Design a protein with these regions (language model features):
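Internal, Lys/Arg-enriched amphipathic helical interaction segments that engage polyanionic partners
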Residues: 7-9
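Non-transmembrane accessory domains of multi-pass membrane transporters/channels
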Residues: 11-62
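Short, small-residue-biased leader/transition segments that mark boundaries at the very start
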Residues: 1-5
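Soluble C-terminal extramembrane regulatory/interaction domains of multi-pass membrane proteins
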Residues: 49-63, 69-165
Length: 165
């Protein structure tokens, strides 16, 4: 983690907007802590598990951005809007839960939160996949080159659909 921190700090120092980017990452870290805290306090088992799964995905995305600070600008909406909004929504869910409110409006709000958590997790995963697309394309290009070299040397190498050779 020390090398990641040094790399990120150096990257920020070299950019005119580095201070803003650093502040954005610090805010994202606070938002993730708020989401994690709220998720830990949710008593409904399924909602708790879904909120924790969302937190884990958010953490992976955040860690990826720390390791690849050059991609932070590509994740602005995730960092600025989604993390903050999810933190506030889960915080309100916990507030209603802890207050023991059972009005139809509160139950409907909680139902909507339960319904949206898996969708948010999918969205976070898609964001991470998009950020990692260039690495995936590079690896696929490397595999094509390697396959071509193996074929020219007389080896038949082609991956099947299930990944076996």
């Amino acid at each position: 983690l020390g090398d990641v921190y040094k790399r990120q700090t150096l990257y920020f120092a070299q950019r005119p907007d580095g201070g803003e980017m650093q502040a954005l990452m610090e805010e994202a870290e606070r938002d993730l802590k708020a989401i994690r805290s709220a998720a830990g306090r949710i008593t409904d088992v399924r909602t708790h598990e879904d909120a924790l799964a969302l937190t884990e995905t958010g953490d992976r995305l955040y860690c990826y951005l720390r390791e690849h600070p050059e991609k932070i600008s590509s994740a602005n909406r995730f960092l600025i809007y989604y993390l903050d909004t999810v933190g506030r929504i889960l915080g309100q869910y916990v507030n209603f839960q802890d207050a023991g409110l059972g009005t139809s409006e509160v139950r409907e709000f909680q139902r909507k939160v339960r319904a949206i958590l898996p969708k948010l997790k999918t969205g976070f995963e898609e964001q991470l996949s998009q950020l990692m697309a260039s690495e995936r394309f590079d690896a696929e290009a490397d595999m094509k080159v390697m396959e071509g070299l193996l074929n020219t040397e007389g080896f038949q190498w082609e991956a099947n659909q299930n990944g076996s050779v």
